[in-house]
């Protein structure tokens, strides 16, 4: 069993292609690629922590998308999840749904939240990490200089993680490259 992290898939959200400069011709290609990439990595026995903004609005298709994805899916609620979550059948496809969660990934204490945070439980300790989403690949906002100094705050957004779920070690590697490239 492995643990994977992913955020900001925005299934069904055409504008996310333009907003984030995603390399897809349309939303159908984006959805197909995200599903294909997910299932190429994740087995049915794996846990996938989705750090928010899973989908956009269309609740009936959300349930169908979740059913196509391998693994036990844990949803950390994001700002774009509120609309589709009115469909209880779609929500029921997730193993758990919560706005904030702490887990152990090997010897690490990991706080999971859709939004980046300045501090979290034991954030000054070397074993404590934050994994978040929400910011996509945005390096223009006022928080960016601060975020580049936070080595144990990791962005699980698909826009910097090759549009697929990633392991903790892959998150570290991808975030270091992203921060270095944009600092």
What is each of the regions a protein language model found here?
Residues 91-183:
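Conserved beta-sheet core of the metallophosphoesterase superfamily
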Residues 2-105:
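Core catalytic region of metal-dependent phosphoesterases/phosphodiesterases
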Residues 1-2, 117:
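Short amphipathic alpha-helices and their capping/turn segments at secondary-structure boundaries
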């Amino acid at each position: 069993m492995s643990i994977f992290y992913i955020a900001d898939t925005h299934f069904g959200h055409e504008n996310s292609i333009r907003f984030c400069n995603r390399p897809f011709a349309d939303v159908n290609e984006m959805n197909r690629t995200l599903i294909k990439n997910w299932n190429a990595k994740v087995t049915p026995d794996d846990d996938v922590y989705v750090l928010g903004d899973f989908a956009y609005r269309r609740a009936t298709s959300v349930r169908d998308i979740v059913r196509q994805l391998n693994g036990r899916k844990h949803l950390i609620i994001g700002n774009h999840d509120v609309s589709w979550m009115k469909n209880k059948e779609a929500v029921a496809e997730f193993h758990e749904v919560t706005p904030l969660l702490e887990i152990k990934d090997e010897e690490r204490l990991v706080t999971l939240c859709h939004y980046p945070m300045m501090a979290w439980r034991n954030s000054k300790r070397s074993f404590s990490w934050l994994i978040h989403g929400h910011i996509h690949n945005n390096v223009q906002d006022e928080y960016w200089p601060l975020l580049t100094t936070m080595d144990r705050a990791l962005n699980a957004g698909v826009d910097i993680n090759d549009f697929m779920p990633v392991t903790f070690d892959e998150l570290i590697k991808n975030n270091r490259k992203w921060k270095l490239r944009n600092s």
